Amino acid sequence: MLPRFRSFYGKLIIFILVALCFILYSKVQQNGSPEEPPVAPLVRAAALRGHGRERFEAYSDSENEIARPATQSPYEQIIQLDLQKQKVGLGEQGVAVHLSGAAKERGDEIYKKIALNEELSEQLTYNRSVGDHRNPLCAKQRFDSDSLPTASVVIIFFNEPYSVLLRTVHSTLSTCNEKALKEIILVDDGSDNVELGAKLDYYVRTRIPSGKVTILRLKNRLGLIRARLAGARIATGDVLIFLDAHCEGNIGWCEPLLQRIKESRTSVLVPIIDVIDANDFQYSTNGYKSFQVGGFQWNGHFDWINLPEREKQRQRRECKQEREICPAYSPTMAGGLFAIDRRYFWEVGSYDEQMDGWGGENLEMSFRIWQCGGTIETIPCSRVGHIFRDFHPYKFPNDRDTHGINTARMALVWMDEYINIFFLNRPDLKFHADIGDVTHRVMLRKKLRCKSFEWYLKNIYPEKFVPTKDVQGWGKVHAVNSNICLDDLLQNNEKPYNAGLYPCGKVLQKSQLFSFTNTNVLRNELSCATVQHSESPPYRVVMVPCMENDEFNEQWRYEHQHIIHSNTGMCLDHQGLKSLDDAQVAPCDPHSESQRWTIEH
């Protein structure tokens, strides 16, 4: 055959192949919309969740069945289908997205199982923008990228939705300074989700800049704490930045953290943590003018608190920048997102390696950092969005209360005599067999010459209410002629609720732990007693969040076994009431037995 004919037929074949590819692509894309994307056909991982990592099968739609080419990786085809499902522009700037039709049904069904709309997540691009929610003053900051310490970002995952994990990775790559971001270390804590195996390896190998992402796979599930230690051991950056596997960063969130550690290597830093809705993926904030810092509750749980006025005054005195963007001291940290000098992390004791699973490690590190000479600071110009779920979709090994057991270990080492208040709130942990030996952590405290928990409360968190100090009485508020006690009925203390009545427990329980303060406030740990404004009975006792200044909390008096509300002059009364009824006040009657109460201590 003459050369010109060979050339002609060659071009014709290429033209036909291109035309076929275009027709196939058009069929896949037709009828697509942000509300109801086309179902990706053809090659799929078998179930793609909960099966062996290497099992694949052919998938066919009503019209086509396409065999897997022998020369092409099956993961490439699957990843291409994943990318086809994504809708460019969907959810950009962090706006909410609402699915409809079959996609909504799929999303709702998945949400019931894992508390996250994975159907929607798969339609959002991995590198979507979430907007710039920083204080405008932050944009004026300048950092010398050549002199910033380098960062190793450590992300632990266990059966994290594939698309959510990759969005965390891509967000980190696109929002952190390229020179400063040395590496991202993904630690697989024993996942059995097929997508997180060889498919993830292939994606990282083919679509992430070489050397930027390392995947460390643990043979057995170790839990968050030990998995983080495994990641930290192989990190090579100057700074460790720990992130949860479901985060998206704001513009320039890394640099302020690295700059502050450059200035103060014993400062442990947390960004402002914004909320990404687990259902519609909306990125929301409380604005840039105010933010909260970390506190704790006496039952060992982390708590958010408003920035104390005392801290605002310290910022004005000590900070050279505008106060709104100054580092703010935080008594504790949530623990999911923070930055720490890598060498200091090991010097100050890293994590308690005998803690299992998850929970308690954040307060342990918080108290340890403060008591041993460091600081915990919130950096206002660093903002990261985090998906908060309604429930935890994964069980912990052996269904143990790892949070409670870990917190008890923490309390034994760091809380000194205040451990008694912890056990008042968690009596079930006082003699728990699984707490284990804490000798090596006590030795660490001695080695580091750390301060007392009394010092911590006095100097770092003086706003924290101590139920047994500066009080006229504390414990159960017990009716004299009945086995009935004042009780919070386990209600949500983040908003006002009606106090109630309940049979007195043999052992003091958290729900019946009240204090009558020296400033005449009747309260529990977080809420103060008031009386509902009403034109007629019943006059209910309402618990409202306490004000930092006791002058603004309503006053009560305790006289001759009567608990009297100062504003109304009425007395706490259980006449005609039974268990689970709302607590009430009534006009005082010195002869009424139902108005007589004792305070336990």
UniProtKB/Swiss-Prot annotation:
<feature type="domain" description="Ricin B-type lectin">
    <location>
        <begin position="472"/>
        <end position="600"/>
    </location>
</feature>
<feature type="topological domain" description="Lumenal">
    <location>
        <begin position="29"/>
        <end position="601"/>
    </location>
</feature>
<keyword id="KW-0735">Signal-anchor</keyword>
<dbReference type="InterPro" id="IPR045885">
    <property type="entry name" value="GalNAc-T"/>
</dbReference>
<dbReference type="GO" id="GO:0004653">
    <property type="term" value="F:polypeptide N-acetylgalactosaminyltransferase activity"/>
</dbReference>
<keyword id="KW-0464">Manganese</keyword>
<dbReference type="GO" id="GO:0006493">
    <property type="term" value="P:protein O-linked glycosylation"/>
</dbReference>
<feature type="binding site">
    <location>
        <position position="246"/>
    </location>
    <ligand>
        <name>Mn(2+)</name>
    </ligand>
</feature>
<feature type="binding site">
    <location>
        <position position="189"/>
    </location>
    <ligand>
        <name>substrate</name>
    </ligand>
</feature>
<feature type="region of interest" description="Catalytic subdomain B">
    <location>
        <begin position="327"/>
        <end position="389"/>
    </location>
</feature>
<keyword id="KW-0430">Lectin</keyword>
<feature type="disulfide bond">
    <location>
        <begin position="485"/>
        <end position="504"/>
    </location>
</feature>
<keyword id="KW-0812">Transmembrane</keyword>
<keyword id="KW-1015">Disulfide bond</keyword>
<dbReference type="Pfam" id="PF00652">
    <property type="entry name" value="Ricin_B_lectin"/>
</dbReference>
<feature type="glycosylation site" description="N-linked (GlcNAc...) asparagine">
    <location>
        <position position="127"/>
    </location>
</feature>
<keyword id="KW-1133">Transmembrane helix</keyword>
<protein>
    <recommendedName>
        <fullName>Polypeptide N-acetylgalactosaminyltransferase 1</fullName>
        <ecNumber>2.4.1.41</ecNumber>
    </recommendedName>
</protein>
<keyword id="KW-0472">Membrane</keyword>
<feature type="disulfide bond">
    <location>
        <begin position="571"/>
        <end position="588"/>
    </location>
</feature>
<keyword id="KW-0479">Metal-binding</keyword>
<comment type="similarity">
    <text>Belongs to the glycosyltransferase 2 family. GalNAc-T subfamily.</text>
</comment>
<feature type="disulfide bond">
    <location>
        <begin position="372"/>
        <end position="450"/>
    </location>
</feature>
<feature type="binding site">
    <location>
        <position position="221"/>
    </location>
    <ligand>
        <name>substrate</name>
    </ligand>
</feature>
<feature type="binding site">
    <location>
        <position position="392"/>
    </location>
    <ligand>
        <name>substrate</name>
    </ligand>
</feature>
<dbReference type="GO" id="GO:0005795">
    <property type="term" value="C:Golgi stack"/>
</dbReference>
<dbReference type="GO" id="GO:0005794">
    <property type="term" value="C:Golgi apparatus"/>
</dbReference>
<dbReference type="GO" id="GO:0000139">
    <property type="term" value="C:Golgi membrane"/>
</dbReference>
<keyword id="KW-0325">Glycoprotein</keyword>
<feature type="binding site">
    <location>
        <position position="389"/>
    </location>
    <ligand>
        <name>substrate</name>
    </ligand>
</feature>
<feature type="disulfide bond">
    <location>
        <begin position="528"/>
        <end position="546"/>
    </location>
</feature>
<keyword id="KW-0328">Glycosyltransferase</keyword>
<feature type="disulfide bond">
    <location>
        <begin position="138"/>
        <end position="381"/>
    </location>
</feature>
<dbReference type="GO" id="GO:0046872">
    <property type="term" value="F:metal ion binding"/>
</dbReference>
<feature type="binding site">
    <location>
        <position position="244"/>
    </location>
    <ligand>
        <name>Mn(2+)</name>
    </ligand>
</feature>
<dbReference type="GO" id="GO:0030246">
    <property type="term" value="F:carbohydrate binding"/>
</dbReference>
<feature type="transmembrane region" description="Helical; Signal-anchor for type II membrane protein">
    <location>
        <begin position="8"/>
        <end position="28"/>
    </location>
</feature>
<feature type="binding site">
    <location>
        <position position="386"/>
    </location>
    <ligand>
        <name>Mn(2+)</name>
    </ligand>
</feature>
<feature type="region of interest" description="Catalytic subdomain A">
    <location>
        <begin position="148"/>
        <end position="260"/>
    </location>
</feature>
<keyword id="KW-0333">Golgi apparatus</keyword>
<dbReference type="InterPro" id="IPR000772">
    <property type="entry name" value="Ricin_B_lectin"/>
</dbReference>
<dbReference type="Pfam" id="PF00535">
    <property type="entry name" value="Glycos_transf_2"/>
</dbReference>
